[in-house]
């Protein structure tokens, strides 16, 4: 057997191993993203038990990815794992912010810093949805806290003005957070103003009825 035959066998074996790891990690990443999306939908429906269960399953999926790619770090940074980590960080923060008014740290979520920040940017969109749900249910005042969180998220993301090669598209997340902030501030301001008008009309009606009686 020539040296080239030996080389080809060993290199092909290496690439076969890497390809199998990539396929498994890709499958797991898609599953993590699906679980996180389902978890967030459960939160908006008020099914917190299901949301927690789905997040735990997603966490297990991320751990499996780390094991599968332990010896293939080049595949780890191909991009698809980042998407899974971002979705997980988003789901964890949406749950924590809406149920406990607590923003989790990167260490709490266990994902890489840049993926944590990207997930936080996406969190602003889910917080906008939560605020709109509060407005529809006649509780606009509760939305002020969450609007403040969106603003803090935007201010945080604006600090990371680094090349895209380092932040992996974080600028787009900053733009998203700014859009969510501006639109939601307008919606909430209108809802609060309407609530004040309705309260004034109710007081006027009560006063008028009291005078009649």
Model regions and ranges:
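A structural signal for long alpha-helical coiled-coils and helix-turn connectors
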Residues: 40, 132-135, 158, 185
């Amino acid at each position: 057997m020539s040296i080239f035959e030996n080389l080809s066998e060993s290199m092909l074996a290496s690439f076969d191993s890497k390809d199998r790891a990539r396929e498994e990690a890709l499958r797991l990443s898609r599953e993590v993203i699906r679980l996180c999306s389902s978890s967030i939908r459960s939160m908006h429906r008020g099914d917190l038990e299901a949301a927690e269960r789905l997040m735990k399953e997603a966490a297990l999926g991320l751990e499996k990815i780390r094991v599968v790619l332990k010896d293939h770090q080049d595949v780890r940074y191909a991009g698809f794992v980042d998407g899974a980590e971002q979705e997980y960080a988003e789901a964890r923060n949406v749950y924590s912010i809406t149920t406990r008014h607590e923003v989790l740290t990167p260490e709490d979520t266990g994902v890489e810093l840049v993926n944590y920040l990207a997930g936080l940017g996406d969190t602003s969109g889910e917080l906008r949805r939560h605020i709109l749900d509060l407005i529809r249910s006649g509780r606009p005042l509760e939305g002020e806290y969450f609007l403040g969180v969106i603003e803090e998220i935007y201010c945080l993301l604006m600090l990371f003005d680094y090349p895209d090669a380092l932040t992996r598209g974080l600028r787009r997340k900053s733009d998203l957070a700014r859009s969510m902030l501006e639109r939601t501030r307008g919606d909430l301001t209108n809802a609060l103003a309407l609530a004040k008008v309705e309260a004034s009309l109710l007081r006027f009606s009560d006063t008028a009825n009291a005078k009649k009686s």
